[in-house]
Amino acid sequence: RHLQEAEQRIIAHEKGEGGMTVEIASSEHVKWQMRTWNRLYQLFHDKSRFYPGRLDAKAQEMIEEMFWLYVSKMSRFERANLDHIWSIHGSENHEMMHYSNALLALQALKNSPKYKNRKLPDGRSVEAHYDAWNTYYKEYCVSRAKHGLLVEVFSAYGPSYTLPEIMNMRDLSEDEVLRERMDKILHLIWADWSVGQVAGVRGGGRTRIYQDDPNNIRRLTEWGSRDRWRNM
């Protein structure tokens, strides 16, 4: 019941009428929530490897419809080309939210009797889109491990939204190789953090910094000591 209420509040917030639509499911606000919907679904759907059957049939059907509408717009097959491993769509954390959520939504849909045989707007199957993004993120881990980790380095904004997406893929992917690689990337990120800080205060370079009010005491006291992992 609460999940249905949550969906209706999303629709109302986006000024929709009636049911979920492509425009609402792919909206900026819903994108920020999609990792939670993915986690709920993968943990509790009827065939979950974690806690199967805790989602009732109506809630599961509702979430699958939301996933379908989301990927119908947000999964761009060409973007999953391995040439784009270091491309950034908007910003790093938005990039990760945008496409990793598509991967896990596609994983759900390819295993759903109702959606597994459907074609996305480009004419490709759900499984083809899933395979493309799954391959992309496995290579993402290798490339980031070889050439650098996060682009938004010690940013006050990016990592707190990027890392939960990596954790979702580490926890929820059905691909054992992807889970293992995401786990290793998380270890590398925290190892990098550990060697760059002393007693919780980090030094070194940063990226994506907004010095909108350098005289603000809150900004001054946060400098070097407020890594976003504490607020994840």
Where does each model-flagged region fall?
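Extended polysaccharide-engagement surfaces of secreted carbohydrate-active enzymes
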Residues: 174-232
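Aromatic-lined, polymer-binding surfaces characteristic
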Residues: 1-173
